[in-house]
Curated annotation (Swiss-Prot):
GO terms for biological process: phosphorelay signal transduction system; regulation of DNA-templated transcription. Residues 578-597 bind DNA. Residues 313-533 form the Sigma-54 factor interaction domain. The keyword rRNA-binding does not apply. It comes from the Bacteria. InterPro entries: AAA+_ATPase (IPR003593), Aldolase_TIM (IPR013785), Homeodomain-like_sf (IPR009057), HTH_Fis (IPR002197), P-loop_NTPase (IPR027417), Pyrv/PenolPyrv_kinase-like_dom (IPR015813), Sigma_54_int (IPR002078), TIM-br_IGPS-like (IPR009215). Probable transcriptional regulator that acts in conjunction with sigma-54. Keywords: ATP-binding, DNA-binding, Nucleotide-binding, Plasmid, Transcription, Transcription regulation, Two-component regulatory system. This is Putative transcriptional regulatory protein y4pA. GO terms for molecular function: ATP binding; ATP hydrolysis activity; sequence-specific DNA binding. The keyword Transcription applies. It holds the Pfam family PEP_hydrolase.
Length: 609
């Protein structure tokens, strides 16, 4: 066995099984699973470089497998079943020297039970003494079939021996993970009390040496849901994860996990071989065509600037795309626009975008928060007094933004209706009329229907504002826009302060993507500005971020019962077509999936009996 690699200047911690004892490992994984917008991710790899990269990328645990090592040598994963080397010696050689000293997440040792000459207890003692606190049955007999599988099982070297190994590992206080493929295997593993059960959907597709599969994503999800239901009926505490088959991208992983109610995903080829092949091809091609590539970069940067300028709203999520389409139509009309959304979602920026899109010559954007209406309409002087001009008279062609519209008194709301309907207004204190030829934009932090039902808006005004209503979703409902928003804010910061170009590191993104953002994009900008001051290099990392609280406790949420009915109504309206329902609700499809899981809503309409 090779001596552990020790890099100069890197401290190698002393690892032993008690440091990653069974209870500690499972508690760590459950804590990670409890964070918002989080799915457990395991990386099944075979080199120290891959393990460190996966750990930096946020992997919750590592599987050290002979298949991972073979992939790094250019062979497909299926070669792991061939008797090329003594598998446990092979894995121990690289995992102890390259992986254990340099990652802080739990490492599951891929242990083979095929060799009848090896005592299970002796192998486990050797693995535990090397510092491993967790074990997984790999290579495994579940990939065998037909007569060969029957012969292996008949010789007592198949899946039952693997379960015996996992049970023995638990007695040594080691965490256990079982590979399964069938309902029967899953039930046996659950009965054995295995901590994590990984449903393997077949060898991975994708890349140059990927396998083929006839299994669709939906079929994979439905099969996994059946398996996981069986597991949880036996052992509700068992963590259920999946791997392989048709899943080759994060989006596909999320779709299958959401539909099947999986706790997580294990990536093997999808984490090392497939992206490595693609990235090496791309970087080699980039070196060969650097001039052409730079032109493409310049073009993409121009496109990014265009996206950022478009109506002053940054993002490409479905809800934001829908808002942009709606704004394009509203900007070309004379309808009053009513913008609602939580504080900090960018209502004033959106108002400016609508104003600029309308291209009214000589027009300014003027804002008002006057509850009495005096600054809007002006008022006639009393005897000996002085006449006061209102904004409508002083800026007759401006775009007028009325913030916190619900604070307007009833008289001011009635006068506003007259402006909307006729373009005429009356000053307070007399009946003298003036003409307003500009644009009205109104804003509130409360939903429009709520403003009407609570009596804060008179019904006539609510009905006039409904056709031009635009709802800005909170940042927590469009987290897919966060990277683009971060780039936008850092680019603006660079221009304002003439500072260097900054980018957000993956470690910082992991923190940002799991935060609830109660103050929305306003808070994101503040966080990035603080991080930019703390950062001395070119990359903002997690340690540069200011402390972020638990937004999920503070952020306003609708009553669960009301929100459930609201979502169910949208699904029924659109015959459970989730993409259309999400667009109707103004949230992302991912957010809709999450909320459906939380409220136990069916993924398709129930058949009537």
């Amino acid at each position: 066995m090779a001596d552990p690699i020790v890099h100069p200047g890197v401290h190698r911690p002393e690892f032993s099984a008690p440091l990653h004892a069974r209870a500690e490992i499972i508690a760590t994984l459950r804590a990670a699973l409890g964070k918002p917008n989080t799915t457990l991710v395991g990386a099944a790899i075979g080199t120290g470089m891959a393990a460190q990269a996966a750990s930096r990328g946020g992997a919750d645990f590592i599987l050290a497998l002979n298949a991972g090592r073979l992939r790094s040598m250019g062979a497909p994963s299926i070669f792991s079943l061939l008797a090329l080397r003594k598998s446990n010696d092979f894995v121990l050689d690289f995992a102890q020297s390259e992986i254990l000293p340099f990652v802080k997440v739990p490492v599951f040792f891929g242990a083979s039970a095929f060799d009848p000459r090896c005592s299970i207890e002796a192998e486990l003692e050797r693995i535990a003494d090397a510092g491993f606190g967790a074990i997984v049955n790999f290579p495994t007999s579940i990939f065998l079939d037909g007569r060969f599988r029957a012969d292996i099982e008949g010789a007592g070297l198949g899946f039952q021996r693997e379960l015996e190994m996992l049970r023995a590992a638990q007695k040594r206080n080691m965490a256990t993970l079982a590979y399964v493929r069938t309902v029967a295997e899953a039930q046996q593993a659950a009965t054995a009390g295995v901590d994590i059960i990984n449903l393997n959907l077949g060898w991975n597709v994708g890349g140059t040496v990927g396998s083929r599969t006839e299994l669709s994503l939906r079929q994979a999800a439905e099969y996994a849901k059946i398996i996981f239901r069986q597991i949880r009926a036996i052992s509700e505490d068992t963590l259920c994860v999946l791997e392989g088959g048709p899943i080759v991208s994060p989006d596909q992983m999320y779709e299958v996990s959401a539909l099947s109610k999986a706790d997580g995903y294990i990536g093997g080829s999808t984490i090392d071989r497939v992206p490595l092949e693609a990235s090496m091809e791309q970087i080699t091609s980039a070196f060969k065509s650097v001039g052409t590539l730079q032109k493409r970069i310049d073009e993409l940067e121009r496109q990014l600037e265009h996206v950022q300028r478009e109506y002053s709203i940054v993002g490409r999520s479905p809800s934001i795309q829908q808002i942009k389409q709606r704004i394009e139509k509203l900007a070309a009309s004379s309808l009053p626009v009513m913008i609602t959304g939580q504080a900090g979602t960018g209502k004033k920026l959106l108002a400016r975008g609508i104003h600029e899109a309308a291209r009214r010559s000589g027009s300014k954007l003027i804002s008002s928060e006057d509850a009495s209406g005096e600054s809007l309409f002006g008022f006639a002087p009393s005897e000996g007094g002085r006449k006061v001009l209102g904004l409508l008279q002083y800026h007759p062609k401006a775009t007028l933004l009325i913030e916190s519209v619900e604070c307007l008194c009833v008289d001011a709301q009635e006068r506003l209706i007259e402006v909307i309907e006729t373009g005429a207004y009356r000053r307070l204190g007399d009946n003298e009329r003036g003409r307003f030829e500009g644009r009205l934009i109104l804003a509130s932090t409360r939903p429009l229907p709520e403003l009407g039902s609570s009596g804060q808006l008179i019904p006539a005004l609510e009905s006039r504002l409904a056709p031009g209503h635009v709802f800005l979703p909170p940042l927590c409902d469009r987290l897919e826009d966060l990277p683009l928003l971060a780039e936008h804010f850092l680019q603006a910061l660079r221009k304002d302060r003439r500072s260097r170009k900054l980018s957000v590191d993956h470690s910082a993104y992991r923190v940002l993507m799991t935060y609830g953002w109660p103050e929305n994009i306003r808070e994101l900008r503040s966080v990035l500005e603080t991080a930019a001051i703390r950062c001395e290099g070119d990359w903002i990392k997690s340690e540069h971020l200011p402390p972020l609280g638990d937004a999920n406790a503070d952020a306003p949420h609708p009553h669960p019962g009301e929100e459930r009915e609201w979502i169910l109504d949208a699904l029924q309206r659109h015959r459970f077509r989730r993409g259309e329902a999400a667009r109707y609700l103004g949230i992302s499809r991912k957010t809709l999936y999450n909320k459906m899981r939380v409220y136990g809503l069916p993924l398709q309409p129930r058949e009537r009996s």
